Curated annotation (Swiss-Prot):
PANTHER family: RIBOSE-5-PHOSPHATE ISOMERASE. SUPFAM superfamilies: D-ribose-5-phosphate isomerase (RpiA), lid domain, NagB/RpiA/CoA transferase-like. It comes from the Bacteria. Homodimer. Belongs to the ribose 5-phosphate isomerase family. Its EC number is 5.3.1.6. This is Ribose-5-phosphate isomerase A. The lineage of its organism: Bacteria, Pseudomonadati, Pseudomonadota, Alphaproteobacteria, Rhodobacterales.
Length: 250
């Protein structure tokens, strides 16, 4: 690993390394997707290599699967694992109730399936990801390509009656073409600025024809590990007044 990192990378690495401490021998793990989750995969691989830690990893994207295999982490499918002990993943935003926005890496469908098939979900994030109210980060919604314009119109219509600010819905692109998820679906990003009732919004979106899944993770995350630019880490459990500070130096 590089000797010097930016404060943001230091925070991500610190959170990832602390979260990997929760992994025990013999566990079946959900491996998240994104820049912070990539640090976690590297830290996990280090424990596998140096400690002989025995784990099975279920990746939440083709990118994570490729990285895990390259680093020597045994990879299995969720169908093979059936149920997981722990999932560790990043988040684009989280609030005080550990509601999350995920999907900035376009892997929200597999991420949610894996997280809900786990006994526990730990989110790793830098301190900037904590918000008083969700909505500053665009909310991803995965939709099937067929009729996506109609699906977008239905989403825009549904937003009118909900407690949100901002109703712009855009198609995520990769260059000139629509971005494709691992399932060959599209992503619509909802630019809402504020989400008053995340649960209501999540339920409403998933009732719209053409919507596959949305990036709101409600009642799924149990623990958040927050990294700071100076290497400190805060571990927070939902419902417990517990803050653990640790200096994770190089």
């Amino acid at each position: 690993m590089p000797a010097e990192r930016s404060p943001i990378d230091t925070a991500k690495f610190a959170a990832a390394r602390r979260a990997v401490d929760f992994v025990q021998d013999g566990m079946k793990l959900g491996l998240g997707t994104g820049s912070t989750a990539a640090w976690m995969v590297r830290c996990l691989a280090e424990r596998v290599r140096e400690e002989g830690l025995r784990v099975q990893g279920v990746p939440t994207s083709s990118r994570t699967a490729e990285l895990a295999r390259e680093l020597g982490i045994p990879v299995v499918t969720l169908d093979e694992a059936r149920w997981l002990d722990l999932t560790i993943d990043g988040a684009d935003e989280f609030d005080s109730e550990f509601n999350l926005i995920k999907g900035g890496g376009a892997a929200l469908l597999q991420e949610k399936i894996v997280a809900t098939a786990s006994d526990r979900m730990i989110v790793i994030a830098d301190a900037a990801k904590e918000v008083a109210q969700l909505g500053a980060f665009p909310l991803p919604v995965e939709v099937i390509p067929f009729g996506w314009q109609s699906t977008r119109m239905l989403i825009e219509e549904a937003l009118i009656g909900l407690d949100v600010l901002g109703r712009e819905v855009t198609l995520r692109r990769s260059g000139e073409a629509p971005l494709l998820t691992d399932e060959k679906n599209y992503i619509l990003d909802l630019h809402l600025t504020r989400i008053g009732h995340p649960r209501q919004l999540a339920l409403t979106l998933n009732q719209i024809a053409g919507v596959v899944e949305n990036g709101l993770f409600i009642d799924i995350c149990d623990t958040v590990v927050v990294g700071h630019g100076d290497g400190r880490v805060t571990v927070r459990d939902l419902g417990a007044s517990r803050n653990i500070f640790a200096d994770l130096g190089e």
